[in-house]
């Protein structure tokens, strides 16, 4: 029997995500190997986009779910929607209803999604930030 307790790796996998994406006690932990971890991360994000959707209101939910877990995001979103009917099903509804959500979700997820978008902006425009790199979208394998 094995047990992971904390998220690890460059791409922040918790144990259950790692197992879902191919990590197991019989293999070296792929969560700490860059290429397998990146592939697993992309696969997991694709699954989350399949669950939450690819529209402009849905992608931030999928990103937030990557950080907090599908259950954590879904339960907090439901709390926010239950407290104010008529609000859109989006990340900004979570922000607007933060006082009704778990403290852990507020502390981590409220920062994670904006940081994700900030990293994407820097990754696509590295020269604007003084980085001598090509935009991330120009790299291929």
Walk through the language-model features, giving the residues of each:
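Substrate-binding/active-site groove segments that recognize
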Residues: 1-26, 37-45
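Extracytoplasmic and endomembrane cell-envelope/extracellular-matrix remodeling and assembly machinery
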Residues: 19, 24-28, 35, 39, ...
